[in-house]
Amino acid sequence: MPKTVVIPPGTGKPLAPYVPGTLADGVLYVSGTLPLDAEANVVHEGDAGAQTRHVLETIKGVVEAAGGSMDDITFNHIFLKDWADYGAINAVYATYFPGEKPARYCIQCGLVKPAALVEIASVAHIGKPV
């Protein structure tokens, strides 16, 4: 089955050759999302909670552009720069998934933008049951 590229209105230019999301057979794959503005500048420097909110709002835009909602997210891949930010990231994250939580993992690593503190990639099931 062919894939559909998902690019929400107002999306900035990606840092590399990728798109914000692809939808194939009812499954949406959201690219790793950094806390960037439309010009690819890091926003909310030094504030992991605010960066997490920005990232999740961006992901929400991709999911909604594909016809879904945050409740459709089944898996999140979370990359954080420093474990010291784990609590702040989780506090904001929990507000986006108040009911049943998606599966996820979280690892500490370097990120492509030095001022970025968090990056999240998501998988959502949108459409008919698989």
UniProtKB/Swiss-Prot annotation:
The keyword S-adenosyl-L-methionine does not apply. Keywords: Hydrolase. One of its GO terms (cellular component) is cytosol. It is an enzyme of class 3 (hydrolase). InterPro entries: RutC, RutC-like_sf, YjgF/YER057c/UK114. GO terms for biological process: nitrogen utilization; uracil catabolic process. GO terms for molecular function: deaminase activity. It comes from the Bacteria. It holds the Pfam family Ribonuc_L-PSP. Involved in pyrimidine catabolism. Catalyzes the deamination of 3-aminoacrylate to malonic semialdehyde, a reaction that can also occur spontaneously. RutC may facilitate the reaction and modulate the metabolic fitness, rather than catalyzing essential functions. This is 3-aminoacrylate deaminase RutC. It comes from Methylorubrum extorquens (strain ATCC 14718 / DSM 1338 / JCM 2805 / NCIMB 9133 / AM1). The gene is rutC.
